[in-house]
Amino acid sequence: MQAKAVAKSVRIAPRKVRLVVDLIRGKEVGEAIAILNHTQRGASPVVEKVLKSAIANAEHNYEMDADSLVISEAFVNEGATLKRFRPRAQGRASRINKRTSHITVVVTEKKEG
């Protein structure tokens, strides 16, 4: 059985969130939370919140044991991009893309043996 949590339209660029998500993929839940607590990146608290939500979903909805959970999938997709303009010299303007992310974390119970 697997439990999943998704955070949509998080205002951090997907490229930056992927750096954090790559650190925890395939790890045990306790180890992943420790890694996120000691990673100094802006996306770390957001990814930790999604992971804790996935753990809570596993415990509440599927009655899994939190100590035996492993992160089976963790991925980041690109959300909608907010397009903004920055004034430049000579009356010109350049476009600023404010990118958003959809963060998904899936946890499963560790296979015994």
Curated annotation (Swiss-Prot):
Its domain of life reads Bacteria
Q: Which gene encodes it?
A: rplV
Q: Which GO terms describe its molecular function?
A: rRNA binding; structural constituent of ribosome
Describe the function of this protein.
This protein binds specifically to 23S rRNA; its binding is stimulated by other ribosomal proteins, e.g. L4, L17, and L20. It is important during the early stages of 50S assembly. It makes multiple contacts with different domains of the 23S rRNA in the assembled 50S subunit and ribosome. The globular domain of the protein is located near the polypeptide exit tunnel on the outside of the subunit, while an extended beta-hairpin is found that lines the wall of the exit tunnel in the center of the 70S ribosome.
> One short Pfam family name for this protein?
Ribosomal_L22
- Which CDD domains does the UniProt record give? Ribosomal_L22
Offer a single GO CC term for the protein. Answer: cytosolic large ribosomal subunit
Q: Which UniProt keywords apply?
A: Ribonucleoprotein, Ribosomal protein, RNA-binding, rRNA-binding
Q: Which InterPro entries match?
A: Ribosomal_uL22 (IPR001063), Ribosomal_uL22_bac/chlpt-type (IPR005727), Ribosomal_uL22_bac/org-type (IPR047867), Ribosomal_uL22_CS (IPR018260), Ribosomal_uL22_sf (IPR036394)
Please report the organism this UniProt entry assigns to the protein: Oceanobacillus iheyensis (strain DSM 14371 / CIP 107618 / JCM 11309 / KCTC 3954 / HTE831)
Q: What is this protein called?
A: Large ribosomal subunit protein uL22
Q: How does it assemble?
A: Part of the 50S ribosomal subunit.
Gene Ontology biological process terms from the UniProt entry: translation
Look up keyword RNA-binding and say if it applies.
yes
Family label: Belongs to the universal ribosomal protein uL22 family.
